[in-house]
Amino acid sequence: MSSAAADRRRAEAGTGSAAAAAAAAGEGDVGRFLAAAERMGLPGFSPSDLDTGPVSSVVTCLLALRDQFVSHDVGGLSCSLPEKVMMQSMEFPRKENDPGTQNSEGRRKIPKNPAMSEPSSPLSQTTLSSISRHAGHSFHDVFQLRQGRYSDLPSSKISEMMKSTSLDNAPTQSLLSVVNVILDELVETKIGEIPYHLACLLRKVILEIERRISTQAEHIRNQNNLMKAREEKYKSRIRVLEALASGTSDQTHVNSNATNGKAHVSPDHAVHQMKMEKDKTEDKKRLAEKDVVLLVKDKEEDVTRLTKDKEDMAKLLKDKEDIIRLMKEKEEMVWMMREKENMVSLNNGRVEDKHQLTDKDVANSAKYRNEIIKLMKEKEDSNDTIMKLNIELEAMKSSYEGTRILLDSKKKEVLQLLMDKESIEYIVSQLKQELAIERSSHQTHIQELETRAFQANNKLEQRIKEMELMLEDSKTRVRDLEELLESRSQIWEQKEIRLNQFIGLQIQNIQDLRLSSVSIRHEILHCQKRWSEEICDLGQSLKVLTNAAENYHATLEENRKLFNEVQELKGNIRVHCRIRPFLPGEDQTSTTIEYVGDNGELILANPAKRGKEGHKLFKFNKVLGPSASQDEVFKEIQPLIRSVLDGYNVCIFAYGQTGSGKTYTMTGPENATEKDWGVNYRALNDLFHISRSRRDTVMYKVSVQMIEIYNEQIHDLLGNSGSEKKLGILNASQPNGLAVPDATMHPVNSSSDVIELMRTGLENRSVGATALNERSSRSHSVVTMHIQGVDLKTGVTLRGALHLVDLAGSERVDRSAATGDRLKEAQHINKSLSALGDVIFSLSQKNAHVPYRNSKLTQVLQNSLGGNAKTLMFVQVNPDVSSYAETLSTLKFADRVSGVELGAAKANKEGKDIKEFKEQLSLLKDKIAKKDEEISRLQLQSHNTPRATAKRADSLLKHSSSSPGISSLGSKIQHRRTASGGRIKIVGSRAGSDVDNFSDISDRHSEAGSMQSVDDIQQSREIMGLSKLSMSEMGHNSVDPELPCFGYDDSEGRLSDISDSGLSMGAETDCSMSSVVELTSLPDQDRVSGTQKEQHMAPSTPKDRLHKVATRASRTTTPKTPQSPTLWPKLRDPPPPRSPISTSTGKVRVTQATSSSRNSSTQKRWT
């Protein structure tokens, strides 16, 4: 009995210790508050004043704290109110309890923490719920705005809302919605400054949210402590029950022995007594089971409550995180608005300074009245607070009395239980065995519950520690932000002061400048008037001299301008002379260059002669001295190179003796840097730069060729096989300049691509050492840039070509000491340069015949020297005395070149009509190929014996019609019918040349090609006349009987396609159509009559199409120059009538031209 009482006393002591711990926690909070108030310099109070009174010192401290926060808010509201609200929202939270938790604790009748903020008067549950509902409704009535904004509310309404208790009783979600609405209004209105009353309301709402979060955290800690106390209490009760069970089992054993001893005395009485004991035992068992059920139920309720508290805590933490995130977002937006506001405030600062003095007295009087009203309101608030505290004190006293009465009743119950123990021991002894059986199960269940509770406690403790660490971190960040804000505010204040001073000085300076400008303006007007009078007098006195000087200079300038215009219209070859500087080891004291003028004059002095006879004067477009840099050389020719992008053909070549610096001028030194680049690299770089600048209007495509002429053979320097591959030259009257179809064409997109290709070509170029130059160029190199531009707006196509020619130097064999291969190379070089001199002489004499075909070099330069191109020649001169003869020869050659008139160059433009015309021609070419394939297939089907002969005839037709690069001169194709079988026999004479002898044919016909100026319209008319004649002849005669499906339509289509191919070749090929076609047929009348019907029914679509194309070509491409004869014979005379003999034998002979007419036309063309 004594042990059970001791256990109960220990359980009550544990419960009391839990209450004491909660009270101690509350005292610890009060102590921290007093320490913080003392650091802030606020009046303090004693912790006992909260319990015993008086509370006046407490009210004084709270009022002082409020005044200090209000003063801080008023002072910093205009500049950084959002930051203050953010920092105040992150302050250390005060510990209060949540109303929902208070209600749940009231139901469990657990002693409350004295630090809780709710009233402790004994109110019923219904009363509390009605108050809560009323508070929620009042909050919605106050904060729910139907129309308008929070910023439009008056200050009195905001003050009423803040003083009411609706904030304390409002749901947390409603408070969050209020914060979001206020911030959204600020963002939508873009107001940088928050009104003071609205800021106070926002601050109070945020503080209320933080108070609830901190209250919930404190409540969870208190619940943990209470759970520990309850666990100790339950354990003590279990121990008491176990002790009671053990004592009852012993007593039951004793009673059973006594009962056995007395059984013989009174059986009925024993039975009755056993029934009574059994009933008592059952009652005790039910009570014990009830106690166990209550313990389990209490345990489950505690676990449920802890789970609910944990969920509430998580929800509150999530709400706080949302608030912090929203505040950060709003803070960034308000920061941007504040920056704008600062700019506005700077402009409005001057106006506010003016009104500040007048409004100061009014503000002081209003301030005094506001302070009086404020003090009166604070007095009323203090009285209300005192009344509330008194009510709370009375409530605490009444609760204390109730607790004491409850304690007395508990003591009585304990005594009653002790008295009842003796009577229960006998009954408990009977239940010992049953309890022993159930003990294991209950103990297992209790252990599980204890394990769960321990795990839950560990999790909660770990979470609390994490929250404490986060809270410390938040405090640290708040302090850092406060320091940063303070430093920045000081910096901005200093900047504002300096800016105001600067603005004041600038205003003063502007005023001074205005006054000065007015005075200066008057002085300038006066001076202008005086000067105008003086100038008029001076002009009259110097009129004669001025007129004479102006006439002289104007005449001189006009003569120069007219001379340049005449040179441009004549198309003379521009000649620039560059003098090579002396090399190391040469005698620099003696030179052959006597004088270099600024206008292109150069005097060459003969060291062997004195006086005027030893001096020769030359005049060129420009003379560049030895000190001229590569950049200066390029700037002289830069406008000429840029005309390539406008559709002109430009050729620049360097001429001079070996070792005079031609390769240095055109390419630059080996491994040259950008500063030492030659004309080639600089020109290409400039072209790409301009094309990129015009890419919005014109789209350019650039491709590069690089060849060399070595020993009268053309080699591709950019091909895979290096310089071993030999190439042929086509007619040089192409729109793009050079026409070397087998040379590799590389498309390029940047100057770096071209530089890489040129380096490859220079590595493949033939270079050798001679006595005059260690790296002497042994071949003529030609770099050609083909540029095609399309105007994105008009669709006009521009085609230009830039030819950069580096000629090999002329040399004397006795000086260069060339032998073997070098001697052979020198001979070819001198021969080609001699041929170039002959061409220049013929052009200067304006001879009708120019010997372009004498050398491959002149064939390459044919388009530049005698075609539609702007041409410039660099003459490289060696100033050494020993090279006087070569220098004189070079300058004489350059003088002859400068007198060559090429005619004005024209841009290569193609309109949309020409483009469509070429597309139609390409379609006609495709049709030719299809017809040829069909002919070959039909011939293979119909001719079995003469298969090879028919195949050869078909290939000749295909070659002459579709190959644009091979000419077949004077070919004769005769179709004869044999007497026995009617088979086709084809006899071809002077067939077209193949690819192997391609270069030889180019040599034979280069001269004829150079004089070719026949327009495409004349050729198309002759071709159409030929096709009409052929078709008319074939319409009256029978066709081949072995070609049943090749009727009028096919024959007309084939001839029209062949004529189209001749039209499409234009200036590229010289096809001879002087041939005799003899068509024979078998005497098969049925097939002939059927074929004639098909001829009458055949459509004339190809003929009409060809006529339409020819008509369009005549409108677009008719030149103004007189037409010259061509290799095509004119077919204006009708063919001779057929004889009866030819009719009877079925043989038809169509004579297109005689050999005499062909020879006469060819002779006219070459001359």
From Swiss-Prot:
The intrachain disulfides are none
The Gene Ontology biological process terms listed for this entry are: microtubule-based movement; microtubule-based process
- Which GO terms of the cellular component aspect does the record hold? microtubule; microtubule cytoskeleton
InterPro entries in the cross-refs: Kinesin-like_fam, Kinesin_motor_dom, Kinesin_motor_dom_sf, P-loop_NTPase
Q: Which GO molecular function annotation, any one, does this entry have?
A: ATP binding
The answer on whether this UniProt entry bears the keyword ATP-binding reads: yes
The annotated region (Disordered) lies at: 93-130, 955-974, 1083-1167
This protein's superkingdom? Eukaryota
Q: Which SMART domains match?
A: KISc (SM00129)
- Protein's UniProt keywords contain Oxidoreductase: no
Which sequence ranges form a coiled-coil region, renumbered to this chain? 271-333, 366-398, 432-489, 907-944
Limits of the Kinesin motor domain: 572-900
What spans are recorded as compositionally biased (Polar residues)?
1113-1124, 1151-1167
Q: Which residues bind ATP?
A: 656-663
Q: Compositional bias (Low complexity) at which positions?
A: 117-130, 958-972
Which keywords belong to this entry? ATP-binding, Coiled coil, Microtubule, Motor protein, Nucleotide-binding
Family from the record: Belongs to the TRAFAC class myosin-kinesin ATPase superfamily. Kinesin family. KIN-14 subfamily.
Q: What is this protein called?
A: Kinesin-like protein KIN-14M
Provenance organism: Oryza sativa subsp. japonica (Rice)
